Amino acid sequence: MTCGFNSIGCGFRPGNFSCVSACGPRPSRCCITAAPYRGISCYRGLTGGFGSHSVCGGFRAGSCGRSFGYRSGGVCGPSPPCITTVSVNESLLTPLNLEIDPNAQCVKQEEKEQIKSLNSRFAAFIDKVRFLEQQNKLLETKLQFYQNRECCQSNLEPLFAGYIETLRREAECVEADSGRLASELNHVQEVLEGYKKKYEEEVALRATAENEFVALKKDVDCAYLRKSDLEANVEALIQEIDFLRRLYEEEIRILQSHISDTSVVVKLDNSRDLNMDCIVAEIKAQYDDIATRSRAEAESWYRSKCEEMKATVIRHGETLRRTKEEINELNRMIQRLTAEVENAKCQNSKLEAAVAQSEQQGEAALSDARCKLAELEGALQKAKQDMACLIREYQEVMNSKLGLDIEIATYRRLLEGEEQRLCEGVEAVNVCVSSSRGGVVCGDLCVSGSRPVTGSVCSAPCNGNLVVSTGLCKPCGQLNTTCGGGSCGQGRH
């Protein structure tokens, strides 16, 4: 991994120069500050100031890995476009005694193992992130489902309210019908009472008529008996008249026979002429007249009585027939009214049962709707709480993912720097490894907190930027960084 910018400040004079310098290094003490991921190390032992890309060869500065922050390279530099006179510092051509640490390979192996373990942890974190993303999608789907479900069932309350209002209107109509039917029932009961009174009156009239009929029947029977007696008397009188007639005729015949046997002629000298025939004829005529008048009177009286009784029987029969018809009509009306009353009672009971059932169903539906609404509100509240927890977990996972992305980017830069270092090759240098703070120190080791005596290299987390300056480095001392041409405003740590 290469640094974003390189700045070199020499302590020989206050002036500064850029990172690509055309002049050779001057003997002075330099503090080269590198910026690995973390850890601080100081390097001391280099004399002479030089840039990262110097015309007159020098050391090439860079940073890599979590465990080391400085690497020395070979002498390199671009060839000038033209041959010019170059002044070379002879002190730079002397070989350096860097004293390479023999434990560098072990440290590299440990670093590789650490990278493998970190990669395994990273893969586990990736799997966890994927699992949490799936859980997040599942919970988002559940939340959307519950929200849609709430939206779909939010219309239940007005629906139940309308249904309850309809049931109330029906109950009011049923109550109005019940009142109307009650008034009709009262009217029918009053009419029924009137008909009952009329029926009782007609029954009383019928009883009176039957009593009169019985009395008249007795009178008719008496008249018939009297007629029979009179007819018997008439027959007896007729027989008696016939007997007397025959008797008188026989006496007359006997007398005439006696008279014919005797021829005595008696002459009376009187003015009376006894005529028995006239007397008998007169008596007979009188009796005949009496019998005729008696018969005529009896027949006329019998006929009148019969006609009267017939007229009375016909009149009473007609009255009885009308009374029977009225009684039958009243019975039919009573039966019809009784059936209507029973039907009205049945309808009233059915309507009352329907009203009670409707009220019970409405109350049950309302309580069920309230229970469902409470359950939905509880489910929505629980879904909101679960969503809040999932959002927090998702935020934590995203924070972890962000940290892992940062670590991945750091590992990628470390691996790129390691590959570049392996490609360039390793020179014979003395490397002192300090794995406690993640820095590799070449030369004298400056532990964080101590102050270097000579020029040093400090490795601190500064996003991969290399700062070379004359002065002290944090946390060893106060940093004093000067940048050439005003290209840098502050030192990176």
Curated annotation (Swiss-Prot):
Q: Where is this region: Tail?
A: 419-493
Entry-linked SUPFAM superfamilies: Growth factor receptor domain, Intermediate filament protein, coiled coil region
The disease tied to this protein in UniProt is: Monilethrix: A disorder clinically characterized by alopecia and follicular papules. Affected hairs have uniform elliptical nodes of normal thickness and intermittent constrictions, internodes at which the hair easily breaks. Usually only the scalp is involved, but in severe forms, the secondary sexual hair, eyebrows, eyelashes, and nails may also be affected. Erythrokeratodermia variabilis et progressiva 5: A form of erythrokeratodermia variabilis et progressiva, a genodermatosis characterized by the coexistence of two independent skin lesions: transient erythema and hyperkeratosis that is usually localized but occasionally occurs in its generalized form. Clinical presentation varies significantly within a family and from one family to another. Palmoplantar keratoderma is present in around 50% of cases. EKVP5 inheritance is autosomal recessive.
Positions of the region Linker 1? 147-156
GO cellular component terms, alphabetically, are:
cytosol; extracellular space; keratin filament
Q: Where is this region: Head?
A: 1-111
Map out region (Coil 2) in residue numbers: 275-418
Q: Where is this region: Coil 1A?
A: 112-146
What quaternary structure, including any partners, is listed in this protein's UniProt entry? Heterotetramer of two type I and two type II keratins.
> Which cysteines share a disulfide bond?
none
What is the protein name given in its UniProt record? Keratin, type II cuticular Hb3
Question: What is one Pfam family matched by this protein?
Answer: Filament
Give start and end of each IF rod domain: 111-422
Which parts of this chain are annotated as the region Coil 1B?
Answer: 157-257
**Leftover remarks:** There are two types of hair/microfibrillar keratin, I (acidic) and II (neutral to basic).
Which keywords annotate this record? Coiled coil, Disease variant, Intermediate filament, Isopeptide bond, Keratin, Palmoplantar keratoderma, Ubl conjugation
**Which tissues show it?**
Synthesis begins in the cortex 10-15 cell layers above the apex of the dermal papilla and ends abruptly in the middle of the cortex.
Q: Where do the record's region annotations for Linker 12 lie?
A: 258-274
